[in-house]
Every structure is written in structure tokens, then in C-alpha cells.
Amino acid sequence: MKALVFHSPEKATFEQRDVPTPRPGEALVHIAYNSICGSDLSLYRGVWHGFGYPVVPGHEWSGTVVEINGANGHDQSLVGKNVVGDLTCACGNCAACGRGTPVLCENLQELGFTKDGACAEYMTIPVDNLRPLPDALSLRSACQVEPLAVALNAVSIAGVAPGDRVAVMGAGGIGLMLMQVARHLGGEVTVVSEPVAERRAVAGQLGATELCSAEPGQLAELVARRPELTPDVVLEASGYPAALQEAIEVVRPGGRIGLIGYRVEETGPMSPQHIAVKALTLRGSLGPGGRFDDAVELLAKGDDIAVEPLLSHEFGLADYATALDLALSRTNGNVRSFFNLRD
């Protein structure tokens, strides 16, 4: 099979590999589509956490089950079905798993980071991680189920409620999902902050009231000039410390900040006294948080969540270098580079 493999920072190869054999309780999936996430780019650059080289990246995917190893009693009902699946492979036995937080598993394995992921024609995955797709949801659109689940989890943790004014910082693939989920839940996205003009334009098309660049102080200046834009909730998706500091400054007293993006290579000064003085609530979220079923259902409805503006540039897997370069440069209107593995 064809596979993209990351071997070391900024060293990737397009290889022929044997089709993997599913272990008991695992399925073999024929991958259809996989999109490139910001975390994949950090992994490529070697500035991520909890991973090991060499690894096949990819965790935003869709595909078709071709085989199930039923030695542990799993039935074969998913064979031939189109599916998506959770990257989180938890042990089920540690204290974190016992608390119902498998994403914090002490023995966590993640597809595309510590286990080979979906940038290959075939991938193995625990059967319990799979979610079948309804006929109404195409494989192309379904590769965005995982980022939608991430957004649903994050917006829920941040407590967005009907009537809330919401600011979103960062309008990449996750940021654009966050703003759509916030609107779906009845929030008003008053402002989106994003450095790339084409991504700002997409945010405007998807319903943001106002747009601003992400230069330091721009969002604070806009909110000071237009107090009606002051957010009840800020969803910070860029991962930059300066952005978090600005979120603390612009959110209303008693407001809430959801931390979704993070960059392990970035550090910066903070003024945390404002958290206490303004009585703010900060909540971090990590991964899809068990929201795959909700994401599949919402995306299949086809009315509240638009994925086509996110799927901006399609590539065959052999063109991985161009796909990665475009995603890293964020030029030519790139929101998401994605691979069609059946073309």
C-alpha cells in the first residue's frame, strides 16, 4: 500500500508498505480521505508532544471497513460500511480511564502520533473506536467529523449558551468549526481574529459579525472601540500565549475562555492577575471528548455546518510535499489541505 511516513523533523517520505494485519478487536479500514490538521504540521516539524518517529500521520479521516479480526467476539456487521473513528486509544484500566477521561489515559496511544494513522491506503483501528456513517454523509465531508467533534467538545466545555456573544481567535480549520458550532448553539459570533486575509473572508461568509487581524492589540482595540462586541466567551484556537493574554483582556468580567489551540514550542509573558480581578473562568479542552456520534449526526443534517469552505485544497498522497508546504505557508487561500487516497 501507499503511505506517507514522517521519519524525523521535516523529513517525510512516500513509501510502499505492507497492508497491516488487524489484531484481535481491530478493524482494517480502506482510507478514503484524510485532512491535514495543525497538530500534523507540528508533528512534521518535530514540535509536538507524546509522539514517536517513524510514524504515519493522519487522524481526520473517513474510510470503509474491509476486515474485522473477531477473535475477541466482535461481530462483522461493520464490514463494508463507511466509517470514521476516534484517534484516542485508551487502556481502560488506569485512574484517568476510571474517571471517564480516556483522553488523559496514563497509557494513551493515538492514531497518527504514536500509532500509524490515516495517511495511508489502509489503517488498523480498534473496532470500538469506529462510528458508522449514514448514507446522507459523503466520505469527503466525513473526514471533517473529527474536527467537528473537537469543536463540539470545546464549545460545550466553554459553556456557550444561546445569546452569548462569542469571539474566536484563529480561523483555521478548528477555529472555523468552533464558530459554526457556537452559532449552532445559539451564540452570536461577534468577532473573529485571524492573520490570514483569506481565512478571515471565510469566517465572514460563515457568519462572523466583525473580523480583525491577529496583530497584537488589534482585537482589544476593536472591542474598546465597539463595546457591543465585548464577548461573554472567547474561544482561543491559535495556541499563541499573546493571544491568550489578549483573550483575558477582552472578555467581559465574569466571562469564560475556552483554550483549544496550543503550541508546545511557544512561550510568553502572562499577566494572570486579570483572571482573578475579572473573576474569569478558563477551561481547557483536548480532543473530541466522546462527541463523534453527535458530530456525525450534525454533519449529516447538512444545514448548520459547512465543510466545503474548510476543504480548500485536494491532493493525491504522492503530492504530500506540496500539500504540507501549502498548509505550512497558509497561502493561496489554504484552510485545509486534504488527501484523496482513492483517486
Swiss-Prot record:
For biological process, the GO terms are:
antibiotic biosynthetic process
| Needed cofactors | Zn(2+)
Tell me which residues bind Zn(2+) 1.
37, 59, 146
Q: In which pathway does it act?
A: Metabolic intermediate biosynthesis; 2-deoxystreptamine biosynthesis; 2-deoxystreptamine from D-glucose 6-phosphate: step 3/4; Antibiotic biosynthesis; kanamycin biosynthesis
Cite the binding residues for Zn(2+) 2: 91, 94, 97, 105
Q: Does the keyword NADP apply?
A: yes
Bound how, and how many: what does the cofactor note say? Binds 2 Zn(2+) ions per subunit.
The EC number(s) attached to this protein equal 1.1.1.329
A single Gene Ontology MF term assigned here is:
metal ion binding
Domain of life, per lineage: Bacteria
Q: Which UniProt keywords apply?
A: Antibiotic biosynthesis, Metal-binding, NAD, NADP, Oxidoreductase, Zinc
Q: Name one Pfam family in it.
A: ADH_N
What this protein is reported to do is described as: Catalyzes the oxidation of 2-deoxy-scyllo-inosamine (DOIA) with NAD(+) or NADP(+), forming 3-amino-2,3-dideoxy-scyllo-inosose (amino-DOI).
| Name by which UniProt lists this protein | 2-deoxy-scyllo-inosamine dehydrogenase
Source organism per entry reads Streptomyces kanamyceticus
Gene (UniProt)? kanE
